[in-house]
Design a protein with these regions (language model features):
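Structural signal for interior beta-strand "rungs" in well-ordered beta-sheet cores
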Residues: 1-174
Length: 177
């Protein structure tokens, strides 16, 4: 189901039972899998792939949110595997930002107002709390948790099952115990 006001490039492929709301804009050569829900004020760049069950641009999970048309911006050549969720910002003056060439594995979550750089990887079940930042080429392993307002630096690695509640500097490794 594609809303008549949604803007899709002519090369976009849309799978069965996908829902694309009116304020979504999708760039060239994107592939939208079955049962994907794209909503909110969400401009999406070129060559992105959304696998089955993704929910992209839905309202933030924040009690302060007042049903405003907040934003999520997605760059080019990202992969969103099965059941990935990415929420839009909780304030009109800000946006949730996803750069380019990122890989979001199944079940990963990007909360409101997060900034994800370029070439980052979030493995299965990785979760970013609100306002978190993931810099370029960071690797967040399976079932890792990044607390709200924390930053994961460039080329930093979080090993499987780790959680951080403080910034992880660039070029470092966090290990869960």
């Amino acid at each position: 189901i594609v809303h008549p006001q949604a803007k899709l490039d002519a090369t976009v492929q849309v799978g069965p039972y996908a829902v694309i709301d009116r304020r979504v804009e999708i760039g060239a050569h994107c592939k939208i899998g079955p049962h994907v829900y794209l909503t909110g004020v969400t401009p999406i760049g070129a060559n992105n792939r959304f696998h089955a069950g993704c929910v992209i641009g839905d309202a933030p999970q924040d009690l302060k949110y007042q049903d405003e048309p907040t934003r999520l911006r997605i760059g080019d050549q990202n992969v969103f595997r099965e059941h990935v969720t990415v929420h839009r910002s909780n304030k009109l003056a800000e946006a949730t930002l996803v750069g380019s060439h990122n890989f979001f594995m199944a079940g990963s979550h990007v909360a409101h107002n997060c900034h994800v750089g370029n070439h980052a990887i979030l493995a299965n079940g990785a979760t970013l709390g609100g306002h978190a930042t993931v810099q370029d080429r960071a690797f967040i392993s399976g079932n890792c948790l990044v607390h709200q307002f924390c930053r994961v630096g460039t080329l930093a690695i979080m090993q499987g099952g780790s959680a951080i509640s403080k910034d992880l500097p660039p070029f470092t490794v966090a290990r869960g115990d």
